[in-house]
Amino acid sequence: MKKTLILAFAVTILTTFNTKNLQAQTKDDAILAFNAAIELSKTDMTGAVVKMQDVVKMCTTIGKEADTLKMKANSVLPPWQYNIGNEFINAKKYPQAIAAYEKSRDMAIAYSDANIKEKAESMLAKLYVNDGNSLVNAQKYDEAISQFEKGLKYDPNYSKGYYANAMAYKKKGDNAKMKENMDLAIASATKENDTIIVKAAKNMIGSSLNQEGIAAYNKKAYTEAVTKLNAALGYDFKTKDLYYVLASSNNSLKKYDEAIEAAKSGLEMEVQTNDKTARYYCEIAKAYEGKNDIGNACANYRKAAYGAFAQFSNDKIKNVLKCQ
């Protein structure tokens, strides 16, 4: 009983002492602690952040007299915490870097530091996207998409993030989501004047639409084929084969002027030998025949009468149109 009373008395004395010591803290004490934290930041940024947070607590306890010092202490916390993230990046400790940048962003919001907030968000976007790319390489597409979308929440204008996300959806076979994200990549990259991403994204969408258009053509779904192929052209995706299929599809739909235009565009891209150009002249001839322009039809069937198109074209010339 006696020992218990002695222990209780000792605790009371310590508590009273600590309370008085806390109350006895002055602005000068806070200044000394502030300067010590500044000095520590030269060698130990993580420790310096902890010490500066203690300075903020001291200033809060001291009150209005220490408000200016408290403001100074608060102002260094976001950039210091951001620098901790940089240290982790240099050490290639990326998960720790993410945690540090997220903390610096929170501090930047709390202390109204727009510059550090923007810088932290930019780094977080890059780190999450890099992590997502690693997951794509490991064929973990759903996990990758989750990381990409985390990164894009931090930087909604990060074109490389949208492009990477689109590629993950493509790997999954989700062309609709691929196109959606590629369009966002194009919009963001255009603002950033990133012509490499713009070109790559347009090529990816155009290539996909071209494949869909050719698949529709092979199923004789000519309206769908024309829609898909024209959409591909809208993304600056142009190939001689696309123009040939587009010309043939338009002829099947009796859109003769469009067929002639597409065939001529393909013809310009083709190697200029009779065997190579024959298929385009054949489509042009069909279109003129459909328009009942026999003179132009005959002229173009003659140009088409080579290789695989020779028999068909000669039959048109001799037996169908009876060209002179």
Predicted regions span which residues?
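Residue-level recognition of tetratricopeptide repeat
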Residues: 29, 62, 111, 158, ...
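TPR alpha-solenoid repeat register
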Residues: 65-66, 80, 113-114, 120, ...
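Canonical tetratricopeptide repeat
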Residues: 69, 76, 83, 116, ...
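Register position in tetratricopeptide repeats
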Residues: 83, 90, 130, 137-138, ...
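Terminal, low-structured helical/coil segments at or just beyond the last alpha-helical repeat
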Residues: 196-207, 211-223, 275, 282-286, ...
